[in-house]
Amino acid sequence: VTVGASFRTLGERWDVVVIGAGVAGLSAARNLSDHGLSVVVVEARDRIGGQLYTDRGFTSVPVELGAGLIHGRDAYTWELVAEAEAETVLVGPSDQIADPLPTPEPPHDAEDAAAYLTRLGIPEDRWPPVSIDNEPMHRWSARWMHDSGLFDWWSTPRENFRVPDGYDRILSPLAHGLDIRLSHAVRRVHWSDRGVVLSVDALEGPTEIRADRCVITLPIGVLKSGDVVFSPELPDDHHEALRALDRTDALKLVYEFDRPVFPAEEDVLGWDEDTGFVFWCLSREDPEVVVAWAAGKNARRLTAMTVEDRFAAGLTALAEALDETIPEPVARTTHDWAMDEFSAGAYLFVPPGAHDAPAALAAPVRGVLYFMGEPTTGENTVEGAYVSGYDGTDLLMADL
């Protein structure tokens, strides 16, 4: 399946092949194509967007089953919002939610973030609430959080926005005119100084795609799973970086009710440590759409249940958060990113001792293989993916 123009037949050779049509892959292909290189994008799914996944067929409003927010008014994502002429709405509070760090000595290389903040004397209730979206602080590299500015990010007041007409609106400016092959799952990357040959499972059967260079924007879970084989194996530095990095799980449960259940003045019901849920109200119309979100250990607890029990747990937690009886939903849906074979988890996180791993993975492999996206930045945002694709391909073109 081709989105946009099909510039070449599969038997020909491209300047660059991009693996993955998520935001990082699309921004990489956009930058390369705009600079005159011949580019083909291969995507295992039957849609573009990767973990930006807008479901338009379930309820009366578009529902984000993956990424859902624009973080701050200065995010580069606003460039795409403007190009797509998309409307946005402000969501939730903009208050500072963690204490700024003093000016201390930097963390030790193998120190976890919880131990570091404890050593600085910062009360636990003022730590960055990263466990809402990811793993708890004791699983994070303090050195990486310090060096990447993540502690400062959480201590800075920041407004969040969503796109009510669907976050996937921002994909159109990136994908326009690109040669994108959907339902093309890469199984093997044969690489050498002469270029790459991809072994691909497509709907019409196995095929090969040849290019001088390859951009790889696969999620960390897929890279670690070994489902995509590199032949020959990646250099030791890249192999060790993949081993050191890890991924977390996340789960969204979406409910449609035939009457409003959320307080009129609230968009978000904050994280409850006991249930592990955050709740979002997506529509104040009849019907009303509510999203229950869990990540990390809370998501793993839920995914160990049956699907019915997951939905029941979400409703019970919502009733507790509202302190009232709520009606049965008229419709519901979910997406389990851990069981999604083309994701194999939700977000990346950087464990203690792995602070150098994203940069190591981002290093070009003999001017042929270029890794981009979340595993090379450690950033869990659409903005991070967007910037990574552009920055990474600027580096690629500088090598030409």
Language-model region placement:
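FAD-dinucleotide binding site
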Residues: 1-400
